[in-house]
Curated annotation (Swiss-Prot):
PROSITE patterns: CHIT_BIND_RR_2 (PS51155). Residues 425-448 are annotated as: Disordered. This is Protein lethal(3)malignant blood neoplasm 1. It comes from the Eukaryota. The keyword 4Fe-4S does not apply. Sequence repeats lie at residues 307-327, 328-348, 433-455, 456-475, 476-497, 498-515, 516-533, 534-551, 552-568. It is found in: Cytoplasm; Cytoplasm, Perinuclear region. It comes from Drosophila melanogaster. Keywords: Cytoplasm, Repeat.
Length: 653
């Protein structure tokens, strides 16, 4: 009995113990916690004896908005969101000012609480840089709108886009007119003033060429509409209106097949004609004009008969020395001045030899000039082999070229000899000492020879001055060009010398690096050598003449395209753009030959302005980088606003 009672009591105690343990395991323990990260986020939560949890959390986004969410659970443990609020964050609350004493004093207002440092104004994002400036919602374009077209004002003068004058209009018109046989008269002579072709014939060829161009464009694109003004007006402007992107809901267009075949010979002739057009020399690059010793009233060319064909400026001296000569005769070139001066009785109807034939004429004064049939550009090799080259046609309004071989040229111009010694040449031009007094440059001298550096020499020639002369480094060449004007007729100096030459109106000139050339014509179309060279070059435009940098070659011009004198016939600027902002900018000028020149800059966060000046041509992109630390006084604006914008197309003159 007692054992059973003991067992029952033990079981009851065990049951009570288990019940207590189980009840202790399911007992709800209340808690409370919370934390706050200043100006970023906060969290708070608590649980009561019934097991209900209540809490909230909040965070500040990058746009300065405080988002607070309040949540709670019911007795069953289900999670519910009580409220969600968003309001601007104003920073922590400042402490109130408490008066020190109880004496009646006016309480000072509490100091305004400064806004926190990170009061950002931007859209919320994750991992992005925060901006202090308010977001910009307006649309700002860099380009300025075009001015509205006025109905009463013609739009032909606009130079925007493809409304510019096409550079190949003249070449196409000239080619078509030549194919039609309308320019036969202009191709007969090489150095005479001929009548320009009729305007109607040129306009006819121009209309044919432009109609071919537009027909080809329409056949290729199919959506280009052309507007051509009246073809009878000589100054009619032609414009092209591109309607690219305009979708028409009509039936699909049917394009005509391209059955136009271009003549390759015609295109080559057009390119050749375009290359003969000299380019305009910018005003800063034009050489200075030497003052003339003769007033305009004494220049005999202005007293000629009005019906006569006026010779070019390079023929002034020959006309002045032969006022009674027939004006219908072919006036010799500037290179023939000396031979004409030595043979005043020779008929001007004869073809006067070029500079390469001067010595042979001087040695045979009785030989008839009619037997010499050489014309164009003669070289020393051609003279040695007694071969002729076909005549070269010049533009009537273009200065004739004065050229010879690339071999050592006229004596007095040193070649490959820094001391001034002139090598022997087989071109028939006297080298070294000339007849007469070569050191003093007597009047009987044919072509003076230059002397070594340190001496002052006057080369003999026409009149009292020198016709052709030159000196080596350190010396000075001087002389009078006879009736042409002051200075020698043709002259050049090496590095460090002072060369004077080329009377007024002459288109021949040249100087080398370190020299001081003077006496060029009103518009010098013939460039000298490149920087650092000692080469002399004579020719038309920048295509002929010149020497390679660093060389000491001399001679008149050399062959066409020799040295670095050759360049594309397209000159002048094609476009220009420029835009400047507070922190960056870019400007560039593009030429018609493809060259580009400009600069751009950018200011970084380190207050350093980086500027890149560049030139891009056939040699590649050539930049020059520079840095500049901005001053503390140069306050940087908050916004990168546009200050200047410009874009312009240039018409071809």
């Amino acid at each position: 009995m007692s054992l059973k009672l003991m067992a029952f009591v033990c079981a009851l105690l065990l049951l009570c113990t288990l019940t207590h343990v189980l009840s202790a395991a399911t007992t709800v323990r209340p808690y409370k916690f919370g934390f706050t990260i200043d100006e970023q986020q906060h969290r708070a939560e608590k649980r009561d004896e019934r097991g209900i949890i209540m809490g909230e959390f909040g965070f500040i986004t990058a746009d300065g908005i405080y988002h607070v969410t309040v949540y709670a659970t019911d007795e069953e443990g289900k999670f519910r969101i009580i409220s969600m609020k968003s309001y601007p964050y104003a920073g922590p609350v400042g402490s109130k000012s408490v008066p020190v004493t109880t004496t009646p004093k006016v309480l000072l207002p509490a100091a305004p609480v400064a806004l926190p440092k990170y009061n950002f104004n931007s859209e919320a994002c994750s991992g992005c840089f925060l901006k202090k400036s308010p977001p910009k919602t307006e649309i700002r374009t860099l380009s300025q709108p075009l001015a509205p077209v006025q109905p009463g004002k013609p739009d032909g003068s606009s130079d925007i886009g493809l409304n510019v004058q096409l550079p190949f209009r003249e070449s196409i018109a000239q080619t078509v007119a030549s194919r039609l046989g309308l320019l036969q008269d202009t191709l007969q002579t090489s150095n005479t003033n001929t009548n320009a072709p009729n305007t109607k014939t040129i306009e006819l060829g121009l209309n044919i060429a432009m109609s071919t161009y537009y027909t080809t464009k329409n056949a290729v694109t199919g959506h280009v509409s052309t507007q051509t003004s009246n073809s009878q007006t000589p100054s009619a402007n032609t414009k092209i209106d591109y309607n690219v992107g305009v979708v028409e809901k009509a039936s699909p267009p049917v394009y005509r097949p391209l059955n136009i075949r271009l003549n390759e010979d015609v295109m080559r002739q057009a390119i050749t004609y375009g290359n003969t057009i000299p380019g305009h020399v910018p005003l800063p690059n034009q050489p200075l004009v030497e003052t003339s010793l003769l007033p305009a009233s004494q220049v005999k060319i202005f007293a000629l008969d009005g019906n006569a064909k006026v010779p070019l400026a390079s023929n002034i001296q020959s006309v002045a020395q032969h006022p009674n000569a027939g004006l219908n005769a072919k006036v010799p070139l500037a290179s023939n001045i000396q031979s004409v001066a030595q043979h005043p009785n020779a008929g001007l109807n004869a073809k006067v030899p070029l500079a390469s034939n001067i010595q042979s004429v001087a040695q045979h004064p009785n030989a008839g000039l009619k037997n010499i049939n050489r014309s164009g550009v003669s070289s020393a090799k051609t003279l040695a082999n007694t071969k002729t080259r076909p005549p070269h046609t010049f533009n009537p309004h273009q200065t004739p070229l004065l050229s010879s071989a690339t071999a050592p040229g006229i004596s007095g111009v040193t070649a490959n000899t820094p001391t001034g010694n002139v090598p022997s040449n087989g071109g028939g031009i006297a080298a070294g000492k000339a007849p007469g007094n070569p050191q003093a440059g007597g009047s009987g001298g044919i072509i003076g020879a230059g002397a070594p550096g340190g001496r002052k020499v006057s080369a003999g020639g026409i009149g009292s001055g020198s016709a052709i002369g030159g000196v080596s480094g350190g010396s000075k060449a001087s002389g009078n060009g006879g009736a042409i004007g002051s200075g020698s007729a043709i002259g050049g100096g090496a590095t460090g010398s002072k060369a004077s030459g080329f009377g007024f109106g002459s288109n021949i000139g040249g100087g080398v690096s370190g020299s001081k050339p003077s006496g060029f014509g009103s518009e010098s179309k013939i460039g000298g050598p490149d920087s650092g060279s000692k080469a002399l070059g004579f020719g038309s435009g920048s295509k002929i003449g010149g020497g390679i940098t660093g060389t000491k070659a001399s001679g008149f011009g050399g062959e066409i395209g020799s040295g670095r004198g050759s360049a594309s016939s397209a000159t002048g600027d094609l476009y220009k753009f420029k835009y400047i902002l507070d922190y960056n900018g870019h400007e560039e000028t593009g030429g018609r030959n493809g060259d580009k020149q400009g600069s751009y800059f950018a200011i970084g966060e380190d207050a350093v302005q980086r500027t890149i000046e560049y030139i891009a041509n056939e040699f590649g992109f050539q930049p020059h980088v520079s840095w500049r630390k901005l001053d503390a006084k140069e306050a940087l604006p908050e916004e990168n606003s546009l200050k200047h914008y410009e874009f312009k197309w240039f018409n071809q003159e």
